[in-house]
Curated annotation (Swiss-Prot):
The chain crosses the membrane at residues 9-29. It is a single-pass membrane protein. The keyword Cell inner membrane applies. The gene is mzrA. Modulates the activity of the EnvZ/OmpR two-component regulatory system, probably by directly modulating EnvZ enzymatic activity and increasing stability of phosphorylated OmpR. It comes from Rahnella sp. (strain Y9602). The lineage of its organism: Bacteria, Pseudomonadati, Pseudomonadota, Gammaproteobacteria, Enterobacterales. Interacts with EnvZ. It is found in: Cell inner membrane. Its main location: membrane. This is Modulator protein MzrA. Keywords: Cell inner membrane, Cell membrane, Membrane, Transmembrane, Transmembrane helix.
Length: 127
């Protein structure tokens, strides 16, 4: 009987630790940034004006591409789209409709990479 009591006394703390670990892992995974489907349009050289956001919206909408938003950001336009497949389609459409002199590339928001940089900074404090 003494052995049974001893075994039971180890089970509950172990279960609580496993539950706490599972909760922490679940919270950490839920806080990971979601992959974005955004494109950035910027001039290839200085002095080239950005295309009008409404023009870009109209042309992409005519081709059946659903746009979440078009935002100017640091001398560029950021086009937020629904899915990665629409991002690829929008990239080819934009290359067709925009004149030469624009760079169209995948855009990842700053907050998505900021947590990695923050972890690196925190790691430096531990040693």
């Amino acid at each position: 009987m003494n052995r049974r009591l001893l075994k039971r006394s180890f089970i509950w703390p172990l279960l609580l630790m496993l539950l706490a670990a599972a909760t922490m892992i679940g919270l950490a995974v839920s806080r990971l940034p979601a992959p974005t489907s955004a494109l950035q349009i910027r001039p290839a050289r200085a002095g080239v004006a950005l295309p009008d956001g409404f023009y870009v919206y109209q042309r992409l909408s005519q081709r059946g591409i659903h746009i979440k938003s078009i935002t100017p950001l640091n001398d560029a336009l950021v086009v937020q789209l629904d899915t990665a497949s629409q991002r690829k389609l929008a990239e080819t459409v934009l290359q067709d409709i925009l004149p030469a002199g624009f760079v169209i590339q995948y855009y990842e928001p700053q907050h998505a990479t900021a947590w990695g940089a923050k972890l690196d900074r925190e790691r430096l404090k531990f040693g």
